[in-house]
């Protein structure tokens, strides 16, 4: 009988990326792969775009809020209906395991898996669990964590960050692919790369627009998320979105100015890039980026600047500070043991699935 596994997770790219890394490995080993998500979510878009042989099953999903809202009442029914749909899907497929990367759409399948006796494995990217994973943890077999946790919860297993990204071996790729950009850049200036999510990028975009004098001291790469800003001019390259150029652009950067999302932070750690983290505050998030940034700064991987302190003088001071302590940051990143290759995590997950199914 063909082994089956169900993946779930969505809402943001960060809740899909690891699944897309793992799915080809399961397919290669002869597994039949299914995905439970939202037809209108990024998870459905990414699965279709990947071309992977994956059967997609859609369920109802609702956002779980930490504050009172009448919408919560409707969403409770949506989540309940999503659990019923997931029960039907999982009972019909009879998979050996379910793997969840989080997000609100993942809660019903994890609950359903537990009710049907199917081992459920969850991956948590942030230092503290989001609401969805806090609920899902109660129904999980194992929760893998990216960050070392102070809490000693019995089902937690620290694995570090799972990433395909590695430290660049040379700058030749960047030189070939971005020859036009390099013509506008001054090789005698340091290159800063700004990258953030949708809300985070807008703050960076405005900061760069408001301070054209930055271009006198640095080459600037701005991954903006806004095609109307696309520009290539003296000491400035603004691009809305990158895929194949992501790694070459990172190779060009001497320092990356980023938000505090864990996926990006650990990719930069893997590439050993100097980082200045400007995390989203509690007014725009649940505070997870502040926690992630604090974790990275206390371990000597990066420097932090709070968004409310983002003025040109403060920014320039922090950038100078990072470059002054460059060797310290690189030493800390080089000696870090917080990264794991996709292959090693796949082997660990496979072993845990085998162990859990034997126990059942």
Curated annotation (Swiss-Prot):
Source organism per UniProt: Streptococcus equi subsp. zooepidemicus (strain H70)
InterPro entries: GlcNAc_MurG (IPR006009), Glyco_trans_28_C (IPR007235), GlycoTrans_28_N (IPR004276)
Protein name: UDP-N-acetylglucosamine--N-acetylmuramyl-(pentapeptide) pyrophosphoryl-undecaprenol N-acetylglucosamine transferase
Xref: Pfam families: Glyco_tran_28_C (PF04101), Glyco_transf_28 (PF03033)
Family: Belongs to the glycosyltransferase 28 family. MurG subfamily.
Reaction(s) catalysed by this chain's protein: Mur2Ac(oyl-L-Ala-gamma-D-Glu-L-Lys-D-Ala-D-Ala)-di-trans,octa-cis-undecaprenyl diphosphate + UDP-N-acetyl-alpha-D-glucosamine = beta-D-GlcNAc-(1->4)-Mur2Ac(oyl-L-Ala-gamma-D-Glu-L-Lys-D-Ala-D-Ala)-di-trans,octa-cis-undecaprenyl diphosphate + UDP + H(+)
Lineage: Bacteria, Bacillati, Bacillota, Bacilli, Lactobacillales
Gene3D superfamilies reported in the protein's UniProt record: Glycogen Phosphorylase B
Residues noted as binding UDP-N-acetyl-alpha-D-glucosamine in the record, renumbered to the chain: 12-14, 198, 289
EC assignment: 2.4.1.227
Function (record text): Cell wall formation. Catalyzes the transfer of a GlcNAc subunit on undecaprenyl-pyrophosphoryl-MurNAc-pentapeptide (lipid intermediate I) to form undecaprenyl-pyrophosphoryl-MurNAc-(pentapeptide)GlcNAc (lipid intermediate II).
PANTHER family (UniProt xref): UDP-N-ACETYLGLUCOSAMINE--N-ACETYLMURAMYL-(PENTAPEPTIDE) PYROPHOSPHORYL-UNDECAPRENOL N-ACETYLGLUCOSAMINE TRANSFERASE, UDP-N-ACETYLGLUCOSAMINE--N-ACETYLMURAMYL-(PENTAPEPTIDE) PYROPHOSPHORYL-UNDECAPRENOL N-ACETYLGLUCOSAMINE TRANSFERASE 1
């Amino acid at each position: 009988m063909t082994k089956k596994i169900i993946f779930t997770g969505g809402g943001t790219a960060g809740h899909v990326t690891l699944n897309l890394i793992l799915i080809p490995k399961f397919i290669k080993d002869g597994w039949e792969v299914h995905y439970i998500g939202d037809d209108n979510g990024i998870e459905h878009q990414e699965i279709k775009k990947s071309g992977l042989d994956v059967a997609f099953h859609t369920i109802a999903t609702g956002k779980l809020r930490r504050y009172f809202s009448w919408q919560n009442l409707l969403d409770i029914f949506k989540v309940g209906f999503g659990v019923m749909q997931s029960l039907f899907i999982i009972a019909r497929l009879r998979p050996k395991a379910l793997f969840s990367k989080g997000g609100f759409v993942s809660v019903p399948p994890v609950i359903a898996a537990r009710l049907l006796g199917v081992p459920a494995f969850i991956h948590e990217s942030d230092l503290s669990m989001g609401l969805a994973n806090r609920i899902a943890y109660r129904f999980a077999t194992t929760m893998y964590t990216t960050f070392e946790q102070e809490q000693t919860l019995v089902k937690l297993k620290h694995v570090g960050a799972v990433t395909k990204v590695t430290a660049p071996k040379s700058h030749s790729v960047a030189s070939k692919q971005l020859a036009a950009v390099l013509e506008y850049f001054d090789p005698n200036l340091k290159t800063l790369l700004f990258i953030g999510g949708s809300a985070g990028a807008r703050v960076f975009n405005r900061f760069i627009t408001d301070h054209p004098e930055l271009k006198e001291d640095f080459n600037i790469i701005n991954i903006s998320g806004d095609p109307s800003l696309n520009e290539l001019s003296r000491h400035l390259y603004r691009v809305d979105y990158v895929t194949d150029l992501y790694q070459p652009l990172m190779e060009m950067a001497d320092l990356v100015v980023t938000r505090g999302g864990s996926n990006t932070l650990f990719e930069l750690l893997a590439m050993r890039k100097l980082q200045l983290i400007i995390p989203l505050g509690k007014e725009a998030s649940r505070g997870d980026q502040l926690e992630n940034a604090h974790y990275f700064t206390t371990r000597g991987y990066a420097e932090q600047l709070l968004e409310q302190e983002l003025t040109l003088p403060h920014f320039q001071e922090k950038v100078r500070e990072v470059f002054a302590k460059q060797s310290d940051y690189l030493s800390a990143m080089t000696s870090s043991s917080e990264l794991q290759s996709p292959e090693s995590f796949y082997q660990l997950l496979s072993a845990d699935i085998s162990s859990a199914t034997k126990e059942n």
